[in-house]
């Protein structure tokens, strides 16, 4: 009976454990047209190296727009036509980090940028 209670208690503890996914973006700022910025996203709470990752953005007063995607191993990379040739997505699985290098910035690139799993 005592052993059974221990197992019930252990299961109850494990069921209460939750893994919180966190994605924290940094690197934004003000730049003139034609300038560059590099965004970073620090990931935690999940096995980063197992997931494709994305950058999306939301311009003032508009909906979300997909910007770019990268596969878990960086083998497959995709860009929206609006940023192709100007933006470069990359990742460092050892650092659980996602990046977006943005060059030749335009006024229409003004937005809040989010990384997404």
Curated annotation (Swiss-Prot):
Signal peptide: 1-19
Stretch list, region Complementarity-determining-3: 116-117
Localisation per UniProt entry: Secreted; Cell membrane
KW Cytoplasm (keyword) present: no
Keywords: Adaptive immunity, Cell membrane, Disulfide bond, Immunity, Immunoglobulin, Immunoglobulin domain, Membrane, Secreted, Signal
Region (Framework-1): 20-44
SUPFAM superfamilies: Immunoglobulin
The keyword Cell membrane is assigned to this record: yes
Chain segments carrying region Complementarity-determining-2: 70-77
InterPro entries: Ig-like_dom, Ig-like_dom_sf, Ig-like_fold, Ig_V-set, IgHV
Biological role: V region of the variable domain of immunoglobulin heavy chains that participates in the antigen recognition. Immunoglobulins, also known as antibodies, are membrane-bound or secreted glycoproteins produced by B lymphocytes. In the recognition phase of humoral immunity, the membrane-bound immunoglobulins serve as receptors which, upon binding of a specific antigen, trigger the clonal expansion and differentiation of B lymphocytes into immunoglobulins-secreting plasma cells.
Name of protein: Immunoglobulin heavy variable 3-21
Gene: IGHV3-21
